[in-house]
Swiss-Prot record:
Keywords: DNA damage, DNA repair, DNA replication, DNA-binding, DNA-directed DNA polymerase, Exonuclease, Hydrolase, Nuclease, Nucleotidyltransferase, Transferase. GO terms for molecular function: 3'-5' exonuclease activity; 5'-3' exonuclease activity; DNA binding; DNA-directed DNA polymerase activity. GO terms for biological process: DNA-templated DNA replication; double-strand break repair. This is DNA polymerase I. InterPro entries: 3'-5'_exonuclease_dom (IPR002562), 5-3_exonucl_a-hlix_arch_N (IPR020046), 5-3_exonuclease (IPR002421), 5-3_exonuclease_C_sf (IPR036279), DNA-dir_DNA_pol_A_CS (IPR019760), DNA-dir_DNA_pol_A_palm_dom (IPR001098), DNA/RNA_pol_sf (IPR043502), DNA_polI_H3TH (IPR020045). NCBIfam families: pola (TIGR00593), PRK05755.1 (NF004397). It comes from the Bacteria.
Amino acid sequence: MQEKKTLYLLDAYGLIYRSYHAFARAPLINDSGANVSAVYGFFRSLHTLLCHYRPRYFVAVFDSLTPTFRHVQYPAYKAKRDKTSAELYAQIPLIEEILCALGITVLRHDGFEADDLIATLAKRVAAEHCHVVIISSDKDVLQLVCDTVQVLRLDIDHKWTCCDAAYVQQRWTVMPTQLLDLFSLMGDSSDNVPGVRGIGPKTAAHLLHCFGTLDGIYRHTYSLKEALRTKIVCGKKDAFFSRSLIELRDDVPCVFSLEDSCCIPLDVTSAARIFVREGLHALAQQYRACVQEIDTEATNDTLQMTESSVLTSGRCANECFLSQVEGRASTPEVNSVLKSELKTSAVSGAIPIENRDLRQDVMLARSAGHYRGVTDPVELKRIIDCACANGVVAFDCETDGLHPHDTRLVGFSICFQEAEAFYVPLIVPDVSLHTESTQCTCARSTNVETEKECTEQHGVSASAVQDPAYVQAVMHQLRRLWNDETLTLVMHNGKFDYHVMHRAGVFEHCACNIFDTMVAAWLLDPDRGTYGMDVLAASFFQIRTITFEEVVAKGQTFAHVPYECAVRYAAEDADITFRLYHYLKLRLETAGLLSVFETIEMPLLPILARMEEVGIFLRKDVVQQLTRSFSDLIQQYEHDIFSLAGHEFNIGSPKQLQTVLFQELHLPPGKKNTQGYSTDHSVLKKLARKHPIAEKILLFRDLSKLRSTYTESLAKLADQTGRVHTSFVQIGTATGRLSSRNPNLQNIPIKSTEGRKIRQAFQATVGHELISADYTQIELVVLAHLSQDRNLLNAFRQHIDIHALTAAYIFNVSIDDVQPAMRRIAKTINFGIVYGMSAFRLSDELKISQKEAQSFIYRYFETYPGVYAFSTQVAEQTRKTGYVTSLAGRRRYIRTIDSRNTLERARAERMALNTQIQSSAADIVKIAMIAIQRAFARRPLRAQLLLQVHDELIFEAPAAETAIVKEILFAEMEHAVELSIPLRIHVESGNSWGDFH
């Protein structure tokens, strides 16, 4: 399939203006005394574009030299802008001259702005089924964004940001097609466009969410509140007049051919002469290097490049880089090391991009890094010296496996300056033996005992250890990094690196400060869903990174990767991680989330790593016996189901189950899916009221799941010491709660007999006890604190049974007359409010009518009016800001809070309430975990935190320490944060987890 063509349209004047003012305080003056700030800045930015995005079709679009139709229509258009500097104007002809010399098409049309010409060209090429990338920081061009048109903006930190429909929705909270009407309502003070007086972006967006268009708003003015209606009605003329000014013309009568805009090959020789003439020698050198790099990479279609081609492209990149390294190195030592290193066998980080769907990859560039391997211990020491002096170092380790508990270290990479990174292998290559096939030939040690010793002492891969002294030297430098209290070590998925380094004996207690970019990205957008480095690099920097699958063949490990490929891959990881650090830290600061990150999430990371390493002891014989007893029960349920159906069938087959339930037994079918009528859990629960077979099927399914998920698999997951090591996922939920996987120990049922039996298998080792500390109704306590409802606060202060009290209120009886069934209903409602339960869900939960469920909710809010007021306040505040905030300041964006769909909006409001409560509770538990760990370290104690199951913490301690551990738990957990009412915990100790509660 032929690749779709992509036309790049540059708003030239916007970039010129930005470039000129970037040097306003220190203008660049050439030998002739002329100001060349705009020329230099413009072509530096253009160089980045050309090198990163490799455009084939490119047009630089300029504004009209004469007044435009907008000035004729509205003489005050842009009248408030400062007069453009004569020095800036003088540079525009020179910029056009150089563009033409390069072979880049330059377009302008009298009477029209560049944006109109861009809109016209975008429309024309879209009709030819081409893609368009608009390079502009003008918000007006965002109204052109669609499936085939994207906008590339240069941010204040000089990073290119891809603006697609998702970006527009996030930034302006409307669709691109609604931007014209949004801007018409808002107006634009910089262009002197009036808009509607008193209408800002939030109000304008809200109106468009409700009524769709500007015309729709004016058709429904009767439904607006009086004050808003007055503004809208009075501003009608200005609104539509503003729209006529802001709307981009797509009918500019210009002559244009896509093929005429082809800029390949660039005539750098002609352009370089002009650069030299104007005293811009560095630009001449950069453009020559850029073309050489393009020519070199064009011959290298795959990642497996020959050594000679790698070194050629590396030298080209270095020639460009070395002229500027003086001004970018953080210290003289860094400068010295980098200059000497980059003059040798540097490796270019450029990787070819396959022809893929342009809607996804049109903005993706190659990482322009300068990467090299380091195998000399003396050289490594110098680099680590510079890294430590820098204060911030990105780190990434490479291993021969993906599981942190049984993998070996192959090498590591570091970066302490953007686009420059180093890879240090533990498998030492003999570079002189590399061939054109890039197969790595390593000198292997013949001393088996030495290899075994290195593996046991350092956890490093011994498959190709050349010299134990080298390994010792590398490990010494690793210890320097991880044990430097003044150093910030930046990692992506740092818990994995922490495990590997700890197992390798690099540290006992990590002293450096950890910054995990994966956790930072999650904290900024906890609903994003995916936080892989490759995805973030593409999203934030429009860089396509080398993927693991590209360098590691199926069935092999990183230890088999050829040296040059290993350098490129590993060093790029460190480089991207370093870039992510600066980008994400700034965003954390801007969003007010840096405190949550630094005081909660990062101190928690080593605690979680330690919990995973320790694990919890499992009695294999107990779970094996449970597997047998569960199998007997499952067989009995199966027999009962067959008896009720009248014949045998495959209970696991939805199709056969549909036939039995709805055709043979004539039970009422529920919701329909693509496979017929649903037989899911909710449907079977309803059918259980009508026929016993549904209840038996539910029991059969539940027990089968417990057997396969837990009793059969747990014994296999236990290590040689009998301990099971779950993984705690720090970024697994949008509310900040921790999740558990492989195995998921948080989902073992606590109420069922079978679930309790499974927990019984988790036991303390000889001479130790398990200790459980569980927060008492923490989410209701948080709700009482946040809502300040008097009835709730008084109940907790007086230690009244909150569920009995709620039952007394909603059933209008005294608390002494509350029956167990009443309390059960009240408990469901209490927690249902916290979890955002609708009347429909409550009716299903309590097996009552929806009308009755709704009446219970009404009576609940009558009982606790403060809760109702609080829930309304949360919804309104979330509607204003777009996000909800926890007690500690954690954020979650509720993107459907302004939905025009009533059900969706109500769901979003419940989600906002639930998030604020659940996130705050999660904050409290995390703060308590950190405080407890610090208290243990101060003693010091041998007690260890093993598990976190939402509001419950499980510890293992020597029996002699049980009493003091309980004291610490009460002190730290009940005072983790100060609320209006005290936090309470329930503490138990025993031999097994199943003994508790």
